[in-house]
Amino acid sequence: MTFRSFVLGLSTALFIAGYNHFSDYVVKQGRFISNLMPVAVYGTLLVFLLVINPLLRRLWTKWALTGRELAVIVGFALVACSVPSYGIVECIPTGIMLPKHLQRLEPGWKKIDATAMAPERMLVDVSEDEESYVTDYAKGLAEGDEHISPRQIPWRIWLRPLGFWLPLVLCMAIGTLGLALVFHRQWSRHEQLPYPITRFTRALLPKEGRALGGVFHTRAFWIGFLLIFLVLMNNYMCRWWKDVLIPVRLYLDFRPLNTLVPTLVEGHGLRLLRPTLLFTVIGLAYFLASEVSFSMAFGPFIFCFIAGVLAKYGVVLRTGHHQSVKLESFLFAGGYTGIVLMVFYTGRQYYWSVLKRCFGLRSGDTIAPAAAWGMRVFLVATAGFIAQLIVVGLDWQLAVLYTALCLIIFITVSRTIAETGAFYIGTEVFPGAIIWGFLGATALGPSTMVIMFMVS
């Protein structure tokens, strides 16, 4: 990591965090960060490699960024993508202020004093002037097209909740990064997982002394690139000249055949009969084993068919909202747990050796210092996460169970990305809902459930 790569990476992260809201809600050109492989990052990287980096190399060789430096910058950018959009910015501020607003509007909330069930540290402190603070947040302080000054924001009411939420998020983020150092060697060296997105990125990055990656010198790449570019550009221009150009359909519509597969439709599989051609997915499939691609393609059909069969017997898997107690969530939770158990069993010798080296004990295997330090960071950060849940009122047993479920989700999603390159992953597993379903509302109590669901 060079100094300029650190500065450029940090600047890129700050730009993403600041520009995302403007792009999504002012320009309204679609989600700036739409999935786990954002076009905002990889598209910019492609343009930089094709245009800017060769130009920098022509001006002065040392100005061109190396592959290692670009990897650092991309890493910063990807981490920053977790902050705006669906991440921290859209969830936490609204989640800790909106309950105050809803209590004023909903008679049921007011009758039971719903916000009193949440610990004070988890919500904003509006005791000074609740009417003004809550109304200003709900309606906004800006008038017309005029923007407000940062000084007009009542920062003091946000200090208490942010003092809880930011350390909580940082503990989980730092802990999972440490865990990634532990898993990486086992997954990449011992199990030889394909890492499709990483391999794709590495193919783009230039080697030492070059401005372009090796893939840009391949004729097959340019043929495929130009064909896809022409198709997408034609479809874009069709939005402006609809009467002149003919769009190329990027989907196959088999929905008229739905009467032939009523069981699939009953299992909410109708949209599977209208598959969309995603060129990114097609490209990443070349990095995978054929059986993995086959499983990814036909797995949803099998799941929806089974769901349709169960629905005919009155067993509905998909019902309620995403954090409700439903059978589908428990199916996924069981599957996630099974995957994590398989991961630990497969690398049990390595993980046990890392754990021993973490505490300074000897092990028969050669363990990289980074893995041992990663385990130490993970254990400390996880302990910090559990401690903060206990401080706000969660029993230590539930805090440990909740944290374990969170880690199961992160490990499973990470394993899926490393093994398949899937970048559209919408998990249906929420720790609060799973614990609620297992123990019941009576055993947990309202305050405990509020804490778990707010953290979810």
Model regions and ranges:
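Transmembrane-helix bundle segments that line or gate the permeation/cavity pathway
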Residues: 3-456
